[in-house]
């Protein structure tokens, strides 16, 4: 409220004392804004590889689990969530939730373990649904479009990762027997 009042004052609007309170029952709603749900944000983050959303969600998880919404809190909370899910985290060093810190370290095996859990456990539905679909959505919309790669179109669900000198693709594909297969490829 203080920030909003300051913006108004900077634009020449006179603002009285700002305080907390409850609107009377007779008050009329002027406007309402609703954000996406956390599940929708997770799905967008994965499909579009949105690092800003990833970092914001990391801060949110850090605040919720550790009462620490810092970069470090988000990273620690993320590791804690994975640990609680039975994912080995000894090969994991996180310094942010976006994946942009050059100090972050994660092994292909750890990523594969997360994807195995995503493919087999109902608790990760939003993560599975958020993975981009090859040749169709998000960061994979323009991939798997050649004759040689088209069999993967609409079948491969994956997350891309790109930093200077590093490219990664990790995801899930369902085989002819309806078994989920996971893959992780990291090149640098």
Predicted feature locations:
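C-terminal soluble interaction/assembly domains
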Residues: 87-188
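A small/polar active-site loop signature that marks catalytic segments
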Residues: 1-126
